[in-house]
Amino acid sequence: MVLAPGSCHRRALSSSQDAMVSVIPASQVSIALLEERYGLRETTQPDFFGEWTQGLEELTELEKQYLDRVKTHFKRLLKNPPLLENSVKMVVLSPLLDRAGFYDDPFHIQSEVSVDIAAEDEGQMIRGRIDVLVLKDRFWILVLEAKRSDFDVNVAMGQALAYMLANPESEQPTFAMVSNGQSFLFLKLTKTPQPQYANSRLFSLVNPGNDLYEVLKVMKRIGKMVVAEPQSD
């Protein structure tokens, strides 16, 4: 089987069990399929994904004030529909990437091929797109863009795990963040001794306070790990 997020995706998932190569569009990739074909398993071990709760640096007051403005801007957009499909990146994601330092050396953001998605809600077909960014081949950021800002982040979990499984790096864990601008979910995957993953809790701008504080902390934590840990040749 080959995963085809787009016509020119630079990696592919392959299965030696397949007599013939079959192409699976990324929009159709599910966690169940990855479990069946690649032995992927979800782990409930509390210490498997400690990066989203442990070793987090406190934010400065200026950073908190900045994130408060980001949340205010997003809530203002919600009150004045329709949302532009690229508003997620402009209002929420870009400020987070900036504050996490991902626009600066030694990070280098690469864009993957976008994936078209569709879901039915109360008889209406909702169409959207998943834009994929990758940092140093270790940290994937998937952004769901649609007319509705509450497009469930679970829609992109299968795609995120597929990108992580396709990474040729096998010794180091890989991470992903999935966001629709309103909700954020982090994932961690390791390949040895067998592929397994876990996710963080769901962070949401609907929650009291400002969950962007924790989101930025986790982004910084994972970013430092990606830079610090050596990559195999």
Predicted regions and their residues:
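Acidic, Ala/Val/Gly-enriched low-complexity intrinsically disordered segments
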Residues: 2-4, 12
